């Protein structure tokens, strides 16, 4: 994408010798314009063809506009030439020109390829012309990641949309077809434009979405491709996918592009993409391209710093356009950014169409089709070119093959295949090229500048090139031959390109991570906040960034400095937004990528441009992979040097491309580079200082981007000083890993692999910081295992290596960092750099968190250094430090092997090897299966997740989740862990910051404990760390923003995103006992991601491997809530109490999970650490203040968690303790966590049992009960566990993870997993995998939403959720099994649904994400209602959770009611009570609606599957039946929607928040009142109603009304005592039918109300009167009046009223308000005209004789209440009926309240 094409670095890049060539192509620096050009897709090729760097630059500026035209193939070449030229900065000399012919040829094909790639990768990564084209394709992967984000995610479309979007949409043409079409539409609808506007957000959210979708790109890009073109099943390619994983971003975007154009699978998405329809647009894009490129480039530069756009642009256009376009396009892209975004989407679509046409056409269709259609086959061909190109074929093939599974895991097997073929050849070739990389490094050194340019761009080029090459191979042999010739010419560049591919892969991971972490969570928040606003970090930062990012090429240093600060903020946001360095690298890197270009130019100018060029992550990653990879591959012997070089490079790279995302990271990385890199030898002190300074540096480094600049200069210069080329390359390589680790850190050379692992580790290590301890053992294995888990695994591997390596690296960071320092500081540097990156990514919202993390790292380095270094030095240190590689291998054999094997088998390693590493021996087989399964399941999930992401602009978190998770189930799990790691790391960064700064030194062991859990968590939930970094960043952001919604959204998104992978994970789990355990745990981790509550749920799953819960639970919880403490305490408790068992289970689980080696080790480690962990967690929780604050903020914002907590504490002091622990975990953590471990264990077991139960029926239930009882050891724990279990059972299937898991999970880290682990793993694993996959997906969505909320407010999870559980415990204590049985039934039914929900969940996600769209929401709501009805029916049997429901009523009447129609129905109330805060938060966040909807939808998967439409129909029909009551109900419903809803929401929110129980009751009671005062409420309740509306509206008006009716019903029932309320709610569940009707009514009512808005006041009055009369004379008349009145009264009452009106009009025309009451009287008595008359006369006389005349003035006064009053009267009876129903329990006071409220409202209205 042109956006990132800027690599201000091109100028500095030009400084590089090879960049001298690039020098001509200073435009290359501007190349980031290319994205626009590449938007055309062909322009890259054409530009490649035109290739005159000068002309390219000249054209580059126009090309942005021409880019779309070049997209036409003719201009395409021209556009690409400038873009490609710059992109070709590195490759252009070596392969740029050579590639030019191929690029030309490719251009013809490449319109789709480049179009796709440009659209997808935007070709910025296409370091060379062909690379532009091919790399565009590969950048397609990278960009596509962005693009996929664009397509899949709103951001992607947006980010890609930015100027680069032209190119990207060009790619989008291919990929957007898949992703853009969904993503574009989704993007646009979902908020693509918002993201688009903030291209950074565009890129970032896209990246997040694309990171989610393309970090998942391996999975999510795959998902997009899989989603868009699931047909790209060539799962066989899955192996390649890992290479593609790198590419997956580059390739995946490609794949979607070609897939869309060529691949039918992709094409189907393409049609939705309407890329073809917009095909003409490419010309427009050509015209617009320039502006788009400029505007988009500005945006994209900022954004692509943020996302692939920047990366693409940076890679292709940045080099090309960076110089020129950077200035021109920076300016122009900035202005057209939005245009390109919107226009670009259109143009991109057109380009896409055109490209797809071209792709469809013999050429493009063939290449892309080959990529997409022949994905499986062509990858080989693709590789063939790559083989030719990069002698990397064997390894590319191998790596591609291995990556394919990994990527395939990314779900994008087909995509991976095509991409792997295309990009995997590049990625695999690149990875395999690691050996080739050494050649490449030689080439890279030759091409050093070129390679740097190409390295950064070549990796991009690699993705594109492989894509291009494969495409020619595929589509057109001549093109293939051209590509081959191009490869031959570009042979050097190609290897570099492969490196780039490497970056592409990292991008994938980065994007996925970013998505997962930032896109979903922080991206939604930050990215939405920041990026949505043009990427706050990006647009504001982009301004600065535009200084450095946009102007990065133009103003490399200066912009970088502001960019640094900006990047810092933006990186924080990008990190927050893309908590995973990927997004950081992508979002931040987009910013920083140009910056790194600027920064790196001094050292690695080429790869600065390259970094910027490649993709944020792709470029960075590619550069890292190419340059670092090469160097690393070359330098592996000198592990230290390697690490050092790699690390210096990572510093530069990080500084370079991270320079963008984390200028701070660049600084950090550079500082790390400089302090680590050099400190490895020269800067052990600096490394430590960096650690010490990391925080200053992290924070300051960002701010000190000048330092970063200096560091860029110094670091890069130092890198140059060190090994200018080698070190430069390697550092960048490692940085890529740092990013890659974030992303997919797959471009690890043998030694760099360790480095990459280190950096990868870093990414996890971010999260793994806390994880490091646990990770030192498990993460190594897990790391390996995760790495074994397909593309995501690569990233997971990076993360696992970050966890395992951070086991080695994290400890290296802690102990290992010092160790690496001693080992060479390279690891430390890399780790630190990665940490910086990771930290940055992880701490999207926590720049200070990053800084704190730096401090934490420092502390870990220095403080935990000893503790961490000791355990981790040998085990972790080695993986981290290349010198430690052998040791690491010994200790972290899998991790190190991964790392070591990575160079050759990096891709393969990721799949098999990492599987082996991860699973030990079984891992490889198991992991691949999960990978495959995940791919399959993930494909849909990813697709859906992508949809989510796409639709999720508001809820970008989901994007992250979906994208992230689907990447591959193991990967997803790992990703989840990674997400959790980053999120937790983000929170934990703050926590770690606080705690680790405080506790690290205080509790180095504790720190390590945190790390250990983190590591362990990281193992299963690796991606979670990254993801959750974002999530936590979101909490941070939320805290900062006070956007509970965002945080919850983030969590939701994470949860959602993670959820889909969860299902793949579950599938994977099923496939592999160990694998599935890991998958489940990963799913659990994903669940953790889903919410910190989900985290608890994840702990449930993760607890299966007790290690996991400890790491995930302890770690995740710690960051999010006291949960970490919980987990720590749990782990300590578990370690001590359940120590043997948890250890066994955990070991089993861990081993099953495939931390086998690490799990056992980790188990002991964790076990030993948990004791520290409690301390650390305590401290952490104390330091969790920040997260706790966030949590508290969540709680406060989401729901009056304090009130809830008070009640919750009362109800379940232990649970509240848990929540309190989170609040003040310091005191309780040790005690409560230990109790809770059992509790949670029991609950988790119970829940797991419940989850299993569907499979194992009552077996698990009893076991679960027994275990829960066992877990109940703590009395309250038991209650809670039971309650949780009940809640779990009740909400087991949909809210299984939603609420119960979080609360239980919080408790069950210790208890449940122990006993339930093995069988739960078995039964639960399989069934849960299925149901967990589908339901998890659903529950993920739901639980994201539900748990995301709690996640946002973990206390809500622990407090609110526990609170609900606590009450259910009271209620269900005796009936936990009942609840469980019902939950079980529900679970079974729901799980039965959920498998379908798997497919449905994506839709649900779509719906959820398009919560804006009432249809999906309505469908969702209808299905939810349907299911809610079923659930309500079921609920009676599960009514034991009455208390839960009461709690729900207390906690979340709003959500409750909004969710009541959903999963709330079964245990909705109980769980949703818990979720109520979530829902409240949810309403706060639009995600909440989505959360609510998907959650419910998931709950009502069945209904939703058949129900959404059926329910809609039912609702439609119901509406008619409700019509009679609809006059009444309509008003009420309208009131509910407008006023009642709002009132309910307000009441629910306020009351639920203030007094959950009474509030719920009040809210429930009030809903009728609200309806009565619909007019009054109409305006007033909007805020609460908005909450409600968030969930309701998201459910659609129908859903709203179903909820409203439920509310009414519930409200009517709810008003009854809490206990009665739940019972009534049971009855209310039947109201779901009414709810459906009410929904319809609500819609009709809304219309009518809008029509009779004036009447509504009177209606309100009438209702008030009715209520008044009801209150005064509550007689059956009300019911009769209600019934008769509905029919009779409408006619009879009208005449009496008219008569009365005439009479009373004279009597008191002025007394309209009083008449309201009399009217109400007549309304109820109205069944009898005479009686009505008498009563009306009477009442008007009594209340206000003149009010009845109001009926006559009815016609007179437009507002005359009495026409509506008649209707209102009629309506009132309905309300009255509702009131009576509801008020029977508490009629008078509620009625009075309602009456008064309505009166006041009416008076106000009057």
Curated annotation (Swiss-Prot):
Signal peptide: none
Keywords attached to this entry: Phosphoprotein
PTM-bearing positions, type Phosphoserine: 52, 56, 79, 87-88, 92, 128, 244, 284, 366, 384, 404, 458, 508, 749, 969, 981, 1063, 1154, 1224, 1366, 1441, 1488, 1506, 1555, 1662, 1701, 1757, 1760, 1786
Keyword Chloroplast attached: no
Composition skew (Polar residues), residue ranges: 514-523, 889-900, 1142-1166, 1537-1568
InterPro entries membership: Tankyrase-bd_C, TNKS1BP1-like
Modified residues (Phosphothreonine): 378, 600, 1059, 1163, 1179, 1185, 1226
Gene Ontology, cellular component aspect: cilium; intercellular bridge; microtubule cytoskeleton
Bias type Basic residues, positions: 1649-1666
Annotated spans, Disordered: 38-131, 158-282, 299-320, 355-431, 456-604, 627-696, 860-901, 969-989, 1000-1019, 1134-1178, 1216-1265, 1291-1493, 1512-1627, 1642-1806
Keyword Phosphoprotein in annotation: yes
Compositionally biased residues, Low complexity: 51-70, 82-100, 456-470, 1753-1764
Record field: compositional bias (Basic and acidic residues): 226-236, 386-400, 412-422, 524-549, 564-573, 641-652, 661-674, 969-978, 1169-1178, 1244-1254, 1317-1331, 1393-1410, 1426-1437, 1462-1483, 1522-1531, 1667-1677, 1689-1714
PANTHER family: RIKEN CDNA 2900026A02 GENE, TANKYRASE 1 BINDING PROTEIN
Additional comment: Antibodies against KIAA1671 are present in sera from patients with breast cancer who developed several autoantibodies.
The protein's name: Uncharacterized protein KIAA1671
Gene: KIAA1671
